[in-house]
């Protein structure tokens, strides 16, 4: 089953089935990637080296605005997805829905079941990454 490199959040179930059929280890990265720069490219290359399939969970325009502030995003989610999908190291871009809750991010991570959750030291790590990490209560 062939699937576009750009996947909508609402097609997550079908996407997970495709990943299972492909086999191999999945590396999951999350972020805004609003103004793609060399730091992003190096990070994505390094993340891709950790497994067989690199999936970028791309934040919505609404979430990017909340994380980055007024005037952001510069590029819409569709444009950011197209740019990311053109990079050879990126296998899939999963366009996240707006207003996801911590539990949505956790469920997404459980369903995709990555071998590696690649985290940047940058502040852009986003709610996706912080929600995916265990909380100490």
Can you name each region flagged by the protein language model?
Residues 1-137:
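Nucleotidyltransferase catalytic core that binds NTPs
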């Amino acid at each position: 089953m062939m699937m576009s490199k750009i996947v909508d959040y609402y097609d997550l179930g079908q996407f997970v089935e495709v990943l299972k059929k492909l086999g191999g280890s999945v590396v999951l990265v999350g972020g805004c990637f609003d103004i793609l720069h060399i730091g992003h490219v190096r990070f994505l290359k390094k993340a891709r080296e950790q497994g067989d399939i690199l999936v970028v969970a791309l934040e919505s325009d609404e979430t990017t605005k909340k994380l980055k502030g007024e005037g952001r995003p510069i590029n819409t989610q569709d444009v950011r997805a197209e740019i990311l999908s053109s990079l050879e190291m990126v296998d899939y871009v999963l366009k996240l829905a707006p207003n996801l809750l911590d539990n949505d991010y956790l469920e997404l991570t459980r369903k995709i079941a990555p071998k590696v959750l690649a985290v940047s030291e940058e502040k852009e790590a986003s709610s996706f990454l912080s929600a995916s990490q265990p909380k100490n209560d």
